[in-house]
Structure formats: structure tokens, C-alpha cells
Amino acid sequence: MTSSEPASPEIEQQANSAPRRPRILLAASGSVAAIKFGNLCHSFSEWAEVKAVATRASLHFIDRASLPKDVILYTEEDEWSTWNKVGDSVLHIELRSWADILVIAPLSANTLGKIAGGLCDNLLTCIVRAWDYSKPFFVAPAMNTLMWKNPFTEQHIMSIDELGVSLIPPVTKRLACGDYGNGAMAEPSVIYSTVRLFFESRVQQSGNIVQQPV
């Protein structure tokens, strides 16, 4: 077949059904562990298409220069600046539909409480409120030991577990405040390997390359 000849229907069908990289939506909320968000984005971008979301509080800790150049970071301002009139796309719905997997790392005590209570007062919590829970959703909490041990935290973790959210537990180490105890976010390498192993196992079981967004 020469370059001027049209592709056969069989070839076009194969091209349309070719595997694509998983689409990962990474999000950071307001914990000092957000200083590792750039490393997390780099880990995932080697394997998947990545888009990122940051709450206003998390921006105190995120070094934008540390993010991969091909990763777009969406903030609260983008939620409003991209919509002008009825019929325009809504950012939190667009991101929810685009992603195969949602990962919040770090998940602060405040954002955990909002999600558990169904609140949606910023870009990230609106994405969560609109999320399709048949798609994987991981959280990696990060907070002071006293906050992690608080009875409210236990209730909130139970609430999101009932939704099908997967917990990547915090670890015990020296915390940012100087205390030693449980509550530190798992390392980016652990978060990445946990999500990738889960996703690839799910793909093998289903026989699909990726779960297509709804």
C-alpha cells in the first residue's frame, strides 16, 4: 500500500483501539508533605498521563518549578476563569471525566473531613463529589500524630472507606513539627508503586488496557 492509499477499515480500527497510557489525576491538599508533590508527579509521569490539582493551602508548600514541564497544575482560580457562560465546560467535571484514577497525596485532616462530610467548596472537593466510584480513588493522609489519632479522623476514614476509597496509610517518623509519631505521608515511591500495582492487576483481571472514563 502506498502512502496515498487510504488505510483499510481493519487498520483504522486497530489504530483507534491502540493502548493508551493511564490517566492519573494527582491532587495535593494543605499539608507540609505537599513539598514532595513534585517528586510524586515525576514518578507517575514516567508511566501515565498526569494532570495535577492543588488546593489553595497546598500552594504554600508546592514548588511549581519542581513539577514536570508537561504536567498542568490546576488551582482554585482555574475553576472560575475557565467558565464564562452556560454551555462552557466545567473544570471539575472535565477533570473527573478525563481521569482513570484519582490520587490525593497528601490528604490533610481538613480535606479528609470535607470529603467525609460531602462538602464541595473548592476545585478538589468538587471533583471528589462528582467522582465515579467505580474508578480507583486513593488517598495518602498526612497530619500530626494527635490529629491522626483524633476520633473524628477514625470516623472520617471509615466514611470514605464505605465509598470505596483506598487508603495508603501514613507512616511513623519524625514529623515536620519535631514530634515523632504516626501521621507522615507515605513516600512518593510507595504511593506510586501501590497505585500502579493495583491498576495493572485490575487491567489483567478485566482484560482491558485501561478503564475508559465515563
UniProtKB/Swiss-Prot annotation:
Keyword Electron transport recorded: no
Binding sites annotated in the UniProt record for FMN: 30-32, 55-57, 108-111, 142
Expression induction or repression: Accumulates upon salt stress (NaCl).
Site (Important for catalytic activity): 177
Pathway membership: Cofactor biosynthesis; coenzyme A biosynthesis; CoA from (R)-pantothenate: step 3/5
Chemical reaction(s) catalysed: N-[(R)-4-phosphopantothenoyl]-L-cysteine + H(+) = (R)-4'-phosphopantetheine + CO2
GO molecular function: FMN binding; phosphopantothenoylcysteine decarboxylase activity
Sorted UniProt keywords: Cell membrane, Coenzyme A biosynthesis, Cytoplasm, Decarboxylase, Flavoprotein, FMN, Growth regulation, Lyase, Membrane, Stress response
Positions of N-[(R)-4-phosphopantothenoyl]-L-cysteine binding: 144, 174, 176, 185
Enzyme type, top EC level: lyase
An annotated GO BP: coenzyme A biosynthetic process
Tissue expression summary: Mainly expressed in stems, to a lower extent in flowers, leaves and fruits, and at basal levels in roots.
Co-factor remark: Binds 1 FMN per subunit.
Main location: membrane
Gene Ontology CC terms, in alphabetical order: cytoplasm; phosphopantothenoylcysteine decarboxylase complex; plasma membrane
The enzyme's E.C. designation: 4.1.1.36
Subcellular location: Cell membrane; Cytoplasm
Domain of life: Eukaryota
Reported function: Involved in plant growth, and promotes salt and osmotic tolerance, probably via coenzyme A (CoA) accumulation and endogenous proline accumulation. Catalyzes the decarboxylation of 4'-phosphopantothenoylcysteine to 4'-phosphopantetheine, a key step in coenzyme A biosynthesis. Required for roots development.
Record-stated family: Belongs to the HFCD (homooligomeric flavin containing Cys decarboxylase) superfamily.
Subunit note: Homotrimer.
UniProt-recorded name of the protein: Phosphopantothenoylcysteine decarboxylase HAL3
